[in-house]
Amino acid sequence: MATSTAAVLSPPAVAGLRLAPSPRAAASFRGVSPPARRSVAARAALEPSVVISLSTGLSLVMGRFVFFNFQRENVAKQVPEQNGKTHFEAGDERAKEFAGILKSNDPVGFNLVDVLAWGSIGHIVAYYILATTSNGYDPPFFG
């Protein structure tokens, strides 16, 4: 009886950098086997690269073919004017827009700024889709 009490109350022994197994743990858990491990892998509902690519591509197509004229008309309305003329037409030579970054070979003028803007909108939509599906939200779109 004295040996089992001494084993329970003694400080843990150190063997190298690991703690040596205590006699108490070896005696009490001999009959219990560890539970069988199951191979469970977390799987995403949607492939992120596919969602981001499709969302960005769809956003660029919508920006180029659907919303382009609407966007250009609204930008033209917001140009600063004085007496019905733009500042450049009124004689301010510094009011001319820098055309280097806005120049493109696209027939309607879809330029680098448009690509970056509509591409970022596509990425935002893709992030929203991936975040909501990973939280378990599954909207019944088609049924």
Swiss-Prot record:
Membrane topology qualifier: Multi-pass membrane protein
Q: Provide the protein's localization.
A: Plastid, Chloroplast thylakoid membrane
| GO biological process terms, semicolon-separated | photosynthesis
Query: Which keywords label this protein?
Result: Chloroplast, Membrane, Photosynthesis, Photosystem I, Plastid, Thylakoid, Transit peptide, Transmembrane, Transmembrane helix
Which InterPro entries would you find in this protein's record? PSI_PsaG, PSI_PsaG/PsaK, PSI_PsaG/PsaK_dom, PSI_PsaG/PsaK_pln
Signal sequence, renumbered to the chain: none
Which parts of the chain span the membrane according to its record?
50-70, 112-132
- Pfam families reported in the protein's UniProt record: PSI_PSAK
Annotated organelle transit peptide span = 1-44
Keyword Membrane recorded? yes
Write down any Gene Ontology CC term.
photosystem I
Name the domain of life. Eukaryota
Family per UniProt?
A: Belongs to the PsaG/PsaK family.
Q: Per its database record, what is this protein's job? A: Not yet known.
Q: Return the NCBIfam families for the record.
A: PS_I_psaG_plant (TIGR03051)
Tell me the protein's name: Photosystem I reaction center subunit V, chloroplastic
- This protein's encoding gene: PSAG
